[in-house]
Structures are given as structure tokens and as C-alpha cells.
Amino acid sequence: SSAASDVYKRQVYTMPATGGEPLRITYTATNSRDDLGDRMGPNNIVMTWTPDGQRIVYRNRISDGFSGKLFTVDKEGGLSEVIPLPEGGFCSYSPDGKQLAYNRVMREFRTWKYYKGGMADDIWVYNPGNKTVENVTNNVAQDIFPMWIGDEIFFLSDRDRIMNIFAYNTKTKQTVKVTNFTEYDV
């Protein structure tokens, strides 16, 4: 591929639901580590939208190619704003938009099964109002892809050796298994 096309394929775009021309939202630099997409996910990957639908959250790995930082950018474009966390992966806002459930380490694209090492992901909750983070899963297995719905944060985990859906209740602080696949990952 040409150098020009490489620049464009690692940016964030929006497209009208009815079709039409895509609108380029980000103008971030790329780096020589962009080839790590299979291991770390693509650079500038969209993680979610803010609950008000006005901003896009994406992860950028430009600092060193390995550590992903979360940014937001207006859906019409403009300057990106960093979410003040050391690093971040997939994430989901609380329904009121006041907290963010996220993975600190970006390992969601790794193919290792039942990894329990020091880089295993947990689900953390960031509260920008009081500038705190809390590990809500604190499990040695992979806990990834948080999705905050109501009072629960749903996520995937292989804590029982097979990847299933679990839910953490933010009121009771209890985690329950939602699916029970026993042969293949959900």
C-alpha cells in the first residue's frame, strides 16, 4: 500500500447512517508500531461514544507504540482531549456519564487462552469527579470488554477457563456469571 493510504487507514472517521461521505475526525500521527494490530489492536481504535452522543472515545498508541492512552474527540472533529489515565483499553461509561469502566492493559486482541500473568486485565472504574480508580474485578484471569448497563458492568472473563459473560453489580459489589458455556468461549 502507498504511504498516503497508510496515513488514512489509521484515523477515526464518522459516516452518516444514511450513507454518504465519511468525515475524518482525527489527525493523529502514526508510528512504526502500527503493525502490531494483531497483538494490540489497531492504533486509533474507537472504544465507545460518550453517553450524550457528542464525543468519540478512541485509544491511541503514539507515545511508545505499546501503551494505549484514551482520548475523546468531538463527533464533528477538532482537538482531541486525553482522559487522564496512565493507559486504557476498551471502556464503557456509566449511564449518567460520571464514571468510566475500562481495562488498563490492552490485551484484548491476544490469542493466549487462560492467561494469568501480570498483564492480565481487570475492570477498573474511573471517577473523574473525585479522581479515583477502583479495581472492581480483581481476578487473576482476563476480565475484558466492559459494558455498563444500568447498575451492572458486564464483561468477558475466562476465570473458569472458558470465556463467559459475567456481571458486576455496582450497588452490591458482587459479580455473577451470566452465561455458562463449557466447551467453547462465548
Regions picked out by a protein language model, each given a short descriptive name:
Residues 9-13, 65-71, 110-114, 119-123, ...:
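Structural motif
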Residues 16-20, 74-78, 127-131, 169-173:
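Short loop/turn segments that connect beta-strands within beta-propeller blades
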Residues 1-8:
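Short, small-residue-biased leader/transition segments that mark boundaries at the very start
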Residues 23-26, 32-37, 79-83, 132-137, ...:
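A short beta-strand motif characteristic of beta-propeller blades
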Residues 5, 36, 58-65, 102-119:
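Short, conserved, GDST-rich strand-edge loop motifs in beta-rich repeat architectures
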Residues 28-34, 85-91, 139-144, 181-186:
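Short coil/turn segments at the loop-to-beta-strand junctions that recur within blades
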Residues 5, 53-56, 100, 153-154:
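Hydrophobic beta-strand positions that form the internal "hydrophobic ladder"
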Residues 51-52, 95-96, 148-150:
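Residue-level detector of Asp-centered blade-edge/turn motifs that repeat once per structural unit
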